[in-house]
Swiss-Prot record:
Family of the protein in this entry: Belongs to the plant LTP family.
Signal peptide bounds: 1-25
Protein name as it appears in the record: Non-specific lipid-transfer protein
PROSITE patterns named in the record: PLANT_LTP
InterPro entries per UniProt: Bifun_inhib/LTP/seed_sf, Bifunc_inhib/LTP/seed_store, Plant_nsLTP
UniProt-listed GO biological process terms: lipid transport
GO MF annotation terms: lipid binding
Keyword Transport: yes
Domain of life: Eukaryota
SUPFAM superfamilies named among the record's database cross-references: Bifunctional inhibitor/lipid-transfer protein/seed storage 2S albumin (SSF47699)
Source species: Pinus taeda
Described function: Plant non-specific lipid-transfer proteins transfer phospholipids as well as galactolipids across membranes. May play a role in wax or cutin deposition in the cell walls of expanding epidermal cells and certain secretory tissues.
């Protein structure tokens, strides 16, 4: 009987720990989703991964729209994590990516686009 209670207790503790890990992986409420970031960056693809010398006419307005949604550190970190993943996946030209915030005159969205950035340090 005592063994059964011990097994039940271990099971409950394990379940609680698992649920805490899952809930901890949920984005912070209000943080920008990666889908929003990718959607905003899509008009910039010919510049960031292609051979275009300048961003497309629709790139900067799209980036400024995303910039206006960035309100706090969790937003910038969410954008950073998404861009970090996308930079790895799509072979973003990092020099061009570094120039994009200045070219588009964005302020809050000024986060590095690099596969090597530590997004926890973005504030």
């Amino acid at each position: 009987m005592a063994v059964k209670k011990m097994v039940e207790a271990v099971f409950v503790v394990g379940l609680v720990v698992t649920m805490m890990n899952v809930w901890g992986a949920v984005p912070v409420e209000g943080a920008i989703s990666c889908n929003q970031v990718v959607s905003a960056m899509t008009p910039c693809a010919t510049y960031l991964i292609g051979n275009a010398a300048t961003p497309a006419a629709t790139c900067c307005p799209s980036i400024r729209g995303l910039d206006s949604q960035v309100k706090a550190t969790p937003d910038r970190q969410a954008v950073c994590n998404c861009l970090k993943t996308q930079a790895k996946s799509y072979g973003v030209k990092l020099g061009k990516a570094a120039n994009l915030p200045g070219l588009c005159k964005v302020t809050d969205l000024n986060v590095p686009i690099s596969p090597n950035v530590d997004c926890s340090k973005v504030h």
